Amino acid sequence: MAVPKKKTSKAKRDQRRAHWKRKATIEAQKALSLGKSVLTGRSSFVYPSPEDDEE
């Protein structure tokens, strides 16, 4: 016979949500940092720098 599952506590729910948000914040910071380095021209690992094309 079907038995209802136990309800997840608010503390557990909030803990999981906080962990997910923390991971999302870290990834957003990484993306922002990469975007800044691309715009300032400091990222030779994403796009080859113009000096390499002269050869």
Swiss-Prot record:
It holds the Pfam family Ribosomal_L32p. It comes from the Bacteria. Residues 1-23 have a biased composition (Basic residues). GO terms for biological process: translation. One of its GO terms (molecular function) is structural constituent of ribosome. Residues 1-26 are annotated as: Disordered. InterPro entries: Ribosomal_bL32, Ribosomal_bL32_plant/cyanobact, Ribosomal_zn-bd. One of its GO terms (cellular component) is large ribosomal subunit. The keyword Ribosomal protein applies. Keywords: Ribonucleoprotein, Ribosomal protein. HAMAP family: Ribosomal_bL32. NCBIfam families: rpmF_bact (TIGR01031). PANTHER family: 50S RIBOSOMAL PROTEIN L32, CHLOROPLASTIC (PTHR36083), LARGE RIBOSOMAL SUBUNIT PROTEIN BL32C (PTHR36083:SF1). Belongs to the bacterial ribosomal protein bL32 family. This is Large ribosomal subunit protein bL32. The lineage of its organism: Bacteria, Bacillati, Cyanobacteriota, Cyanophyceae, Oscillatoriophycideae.
